[in-house]
Amino acid sequence: MAVGKVKQIVGPTLDIEFPPGQLPNILNAIKIIDPKDQRELIAEVAMHLGDNQVRCIALSSTDGLVREAQAVDTEAPISIPVGSPTLGRLLNVLGQPIDEMGAIENAEISPIHKASPTFEEQDTQGVIFETGIKVIDLLCPYTKGGKVGLFGGAGVGKSVIVMELIHNIATHHGGYSVFCGIGERTREGNDLWLEMKESGILSKTSLVFGQMNEPPGARMRVGLTGLTMAEHFRDQEHQNVLLFIDNIFRFVQAGSEVSALLGRMPSAVGYQPTLASEIGSLQERITSTKHGSITSVQAIYVPADDYTDPAPASIFPHLDAATTLSRQIAELGIYPAVDPLNSSSRILDPHVLGEEHYQVARQVQKVLQRYKDLQDIIAILGIDELSEEDQLTVSRARRIQKFLSQPFFVAETFTGKKGRFVKLPDTIKGFKMIVEGEMDNIPEQAFYMVGTIEEVFEKAEQMK
């Protein structure tokens, strides 16, 4: 193993000199021993500078590190523990436990940098993945083994939907989940950990965190750490895995910080020039193979609610379904605040979902679109000036809008309402009854924050 010396430290970047002819490869992990307190720091080779020097990105804080510290080339990429021993555990980017529950024993070790599966190995079948959330299952259904984006600005409920999906998958599908927290609030990570413990779903989940307080190197690589764990469950244990990433935008942001530290010329809006290829290298590995599937749900922060920003715009093409959260809908008090007209799915197709589901979904969207078109007229002239047909459309649209809300299990403590998992046939039946006019005489308020259409009747009875 080649041994070098640290020559320069600038924030999270390190320049290390190695003996001639012993330069480490790019992406190799370098172990640096701090001579003062003997602590170990891992850095990753990012570029060769010439003169036998490499520039590395540190994956933990460089505070207190001194020049001339010894650096050892591990001759391999960052490698982490994978498999069953990681279930129920909380790890950092290097696969080290940060839950104070002792070391991870008897786990296989796997490098985080790998090639994506070849086209021959991939499996592309369109099967709906039932989430139990009405608005998602009806209007932007998720594909088993697909990639889903949760788009939304700050504070519209992305993380809550992610937590609800983890809950529903663990209780109704029984599969393994990997949760990857990239550059989000440490408090949210702690809340998630405690909630999972309480609800008893921790034993089916591995958690990997590289939060806001971590250096950019850790935030940039923690996505690959989580993905490597999910790939092991798929390929070696033949499981159907769920990979949750919160937030994929922070992965891009960390890449942008690293790019600036390495002195690369920024591209549009100050992002890194390698934006598309960085996202591609992560997304291409999230796929279904003949062994099993990885279904990924990625929360995507949209800077200043601008969907044309290069970061969300370069993530869009990789997705099978996009669930867009809207501030206007959140302001109406409708949660989950999913925008039914801007959310889309590749499998919203009669050949995949069946004719009934497709027709009901399209009718719901048609009614809501007409209601949206009439908003200006209603605001200026009032609802009484509309034709009878349009008045009926508006009253149905309002019922649909309220019925798209749903109490969540993970939000029980805030709402005081018991969570609901609504099966797909019940969802279709409920919305079909509304668009066909069977519910026109039921008061609007009865549709708010309920599960199935049967609950609407019960609530209407109580309101009398």
Curated annotation (Swiss-Prot):
Q: Which family does it belong to?
A: Belongs to the ATPase alpha/beta chains family.
Record-linked NCBIfam families: atpD
Q: Name one GO molecular function term.
A: ATP binding
Name recorded for this polypeptide: ATP synthase subunit beta
Q: What is its EC number?
A: 7.1.2.2
| Annotated Gene3D superfamilies | 2.40.10.170, Bovine Mitochondrial F1-atpase, Atp Synthase Beta Chain, Chain D, domain 3, P-loop containing nucleotide triphosphate hydrolases
Question: Cross-referenced Pfam families, in alphabetical order?
Answer: ATP-synt_ab, ATP-synt_ab_N, ATP-synt_VA_C
Which EC class is this protein assigned? translocase
Q: Which cellular component terms (GO) are annotated to the entry?
A: plasma membrane; proton-transporting ATP synthase complex
According to its UniProt record, where is this protein located?
Cell membrane
State the function annotated in the UniProt record: Produces ATP from ADP in the presence of a proton gradient across the membrane. The catalytic sites are hosted primarily by the beta subunits.
| Reaction catalysis annotation | ATP + H2O + 4 H(+)(in) = ADP + phosphate + 5 H(+)(out)
